[in-house]
Amino acid sequence: MDVQSEEFRGAQAQIWSQSCSFITSASLKCAVKLGIPDTIDNHGKPITLSELTNALVPPVHPSKAPFIYRLMRVLAKNGFCSEEQLDGETEPLYSLTPSSRILLKKEPLNLRGIVLTMADPVQLKAWESLSDWYQNEDDSSTAFETAHGKNFWGYSSEHMEHAEFFNEAMASDSQLISKLLIGEYKFLFEGLASLVDIGGGTGTIAKAIAKNFPQLKCTVFDLPHVVANLESKENVEFVAGDMFEKIPSANAIFLKWILHDWNDEDCVKILKSCKKAIPAKGGKVIIIDMVMYSDKKDDHLVKTQTSMDMAMLVNFAAKERCEKEWAFLFKEAGFSDYKIYPKLDFTRSLIEVYP
């Protein structure tokens, strides 16, 4: 290849950009841990570099203060803050962008947990073990297990910081989904008398649905240690159990970000359990998950979906699925039909499945 050609320069640019992409993620995580988005927001107007540095709590060490500019420059160049240099001023002014606003602690739908989880050293070690996982013949079913000697859930149960990052991410996501469901997708719950939210955790989504549909009995179905200390109130009940064995009967079963954690064989088992739990007439399963390539023209979306698919492989030996793969699962589990509502949010779709 001619080293002076545009083709070579373009190839160089792509390799350098991708090889350095982790630096952006690490810098964003650093900004979140230092409280930079919240500090800018608390200032109430564009903030100078020195004002920002002096306002950080806990403070940065005085010897490191001169280097905050380097971090802010990376954030600004990647759209996580705006940087403005006014005429006659020696310092730039920084403001939040839409991307950094959804990292604020006060924002109910914040994505802080996603940033902290994806850039967690625990996760990075799993990715570092991916090539070993491909090459080895040990009994580890995931790259995460190759790295840590335990599966994702087992490790999280023993390491609270990792679990807290993940739980924060899931709680914020449930807030987002709740808002979408009781808004644009409210029609899904009309006419239902009962619903079971599988893996519903502390019941964020079930409570939101129950509040807007008082006649609807909502059951949060999760593992015993998850629901052990949760109190059932009004039309929200917490029930312990195993979705592979038996699911409580209801008009509808709700699965948010559950099936992408499991391989095809296990997904069919889960779906068969769901089918047994709903009536043959009028029953349905509501799934929130990715449908890969739902919009092939959106390159940013496709790249994010394929990255998430790799994350499912690394952590769970599972996957994201295209419509054809979803249809296969539904048929294998004995369902007659389904309907996809694309683009529930940036990456996911909503699927109704009928017995």
Curated annotation (Swiss-Prot):
Biophysicochemical property: pH dependence = Optimum pH is 7.0-7.5.
> Carries keyword Transferase?
yes
The source's domain of life comes to: Eukaryota
Xref: InterPro entries: COMT-like (IPR016461), O_MeTrfase_dom (IPR001077), Plant_O-MeTrfase_dimerisation (IPR012967), SAM-dependent_MTases_sf (IPR029063), WH-like_DNA-bd_sf (IPR036388), WH_DNA-bd_sf (IPR036390)
Among the GO biological process terms of this entry, one is: alkaloid biosynthetic process
Q: In which pathway does it act?
A: Alkaloid biosynthesis; vindoline biosynthesis
Catalytic reaction annotation: 16-hydroxytabersonine + S-adenosyl-L-methionine = 16-methoxytabersonine + S-adenosyl-L-homocysteine + H(+)
Q: Which UniProt keywords apply?
A: Alkaloid metabolism, Cytoplasm, Methyltransferase, S-adenosyl-L-methionine, Transferase
Q: What SUPFAM superfamilies is this protein classified in? A: S-adenosyl-L-methionine-dependent methyltransferases, Winged helix' DNA-binding domain
Q: Where in the cell is it found?
A: Cytoplasm
Q: Cite the record's tissue specificity text.
A: Expressed in leaves and flowers. Detected in stems and roots. In leaves, expressed in epidermal cells.
- Can you tell me which residues the record assigns to a coiled coil? none
- Catalytic site: 260
For this protein, the parts annotated as crossing the membrane are none
Q: Give the EC number.
A: 2.1.1.94
Molecular-function GO terms, alphabetical: 11-O-demethyl-17-O-deacetylvindoline O-methyltransferase activity; O-methyltransferase activity; protein homodimerization activity
Entry annotated with the keyword Transferase: yes
- Tell me its family: Belongs to the class I-like SAM-binding methyltransferase superfamily. Cation-independent O-methyltransferase family. COMT subfamily.
Subunit description: Homodimer.
Q: What is the annotated role of this protein in its UniProt record?
A: 16-O-methyltransferase involved in the biosynthesis of vindoline. Highly specific for 16-hydroxytabersonine. No activity with tabersonine, 3-hydroxytyramine, 4-hydroxytyramine, 5-hydroxytryptamine (5HT), 2,3-dihydro-3-hydroxytabersonine, lochnericine, hoerhammericine, 16-hydroxy-2,3-dihydro-3-hydroxytabersonine, 16-hydroxylochnericine, 16-hydroxyhoerhammericine, quercetin, kaempferol and caffeic acid as substrates.
Q: Protein name, please?
A: Tabersonine 16-O-methyltransferase
Q: Encoded by which gene?
A: 16OMT
